[in-house]
Amino acid sequence: MKNVLSIQSHVVYGFAGNKSATFPMQLLGVDVWALNTVQFSNHTQYGKWTGMVIPQEQIREIVTGLDNIEKLQECDALLSGYLGSAEQVDQILFALEQIKLRNPNALYLCDPVMPHPKKSCVVANGVCEALIEKAIPVADIMTPNLHELRQLTEFPINTFDDVLKAVNALIAKGVKKVLVKHLGSAGKINDPDTFEIIMATPEGVWHLSRPLYQFNFEPVGVGDLIAGTFLANLLNGKSDVEAFEAMNNEVAGVMKTTFELGSYELQTIAARFEILNPSSNYKAEKVA
């Protein structure tokens, strides 16, 4: 069994961060060592929540504890998502350094969660800058959305060609795989009823489209689900393109179930059989 140390947010109610990623990854046969960066009552897009940011030193202590019982050599990947403070970025890098010492082949997937002007996603000051400065040089995989891609590259991105230039800039900096979630108006198809996503590697760029469900309130945690299931499929031995397609079909099933149930929260439990055996078969097209 493959193991992932997943360092991201936790919500008591609902599905975001580790709550969104853990169960689907475990369904796919990958164990998740969940280490929380924050513990909130619910995700921040409700507009009100309670809870706390986990002190940065706790991350280091827990990683050290795992090393003390000689478990870091069993860690196949590090996954980072929503961070509660800029200082936590340094603790992520400490975790990566320790894991790589014990398992040099371990992967690092950085989901660079950043504030969005059209969403109530609250991110602490300095996190964006710390991710740009410190995470890009060491990440094997990054999974930004379109807005986060703009912030990571500082490129103006309005067209599909702009997206390609931006992802190639990240690849040039050493990131081996870049997934850009929900291209929106910068998509290749640019249809409001179509969800578009790309994967870029040094070998090329692949594009995939599937239906975009028109929720009254867009569920949170979809990016966490995408990052987690993509990583799980890679660890299970699938090729980049196979993992990209499998993830998209698994996530498509979760989104379809969530929409049909009229839920604001992702319905990963109700959609568990869609994760295990997706009913869709969307295929990626190489575009560059």
From Swiss-Prot:
HAMAP family: PdxY
Entry EC number(s): 2.7.1.35
Amino acids binding ATP: 111, 148, 181
Subunit structure: Homodimer.
Residues that hold substrate according to the record: 9, 44-45, 224
Essential cofactor(s): Mg(2+)
A GO biological-process term: pyridoxal 5'-phosphate salvage
Organism: Haemophilus influenzae (strain PittEE)
Name of this chain's protein: Pyridoxal kinase PdxY
Keyword tags: ATP-binding, Kinase, Magnesium, Nucleotide-binding, Transferase
Gene Ontology cellular-component terms listed: cytosol
Family: Belongs to the pyridoxine kinase family. PdxY subfamily.
NCBIfam families documented for this protein: PRK05756.1, pyridox_kin
Catalytic activity: pyridoxal + ATP = pyridoxal 5'-phosphate + ADP + H(+)
Function, in words: Pyridoxal kinase involved in the salvage pathway of pyridoxal 5'-phosphate (PLP). Catalyzes the phosphorylation of pyridoxal to PLP.
Lineage summary: Bacteria, Pseudomonadati, Pseudomonadota, Gammaproteobacteria, Pasteurellales
Enzyme class, broadest EC rank: transferase
Coiled coil feature spans: none
Domain of life assignment: Bacteria
Presence of the UniProt keyword Kinase in the record: yes
Cross-referenced InterPro entries: PM/HMP-P_kinase-1 (IPR013749), PyrdxlKinase (IPR004625), Pyridoxal_kinase_PdxY (IPR023685), Ribokinase-like (IPR029056)
Protein's gene: pdxY
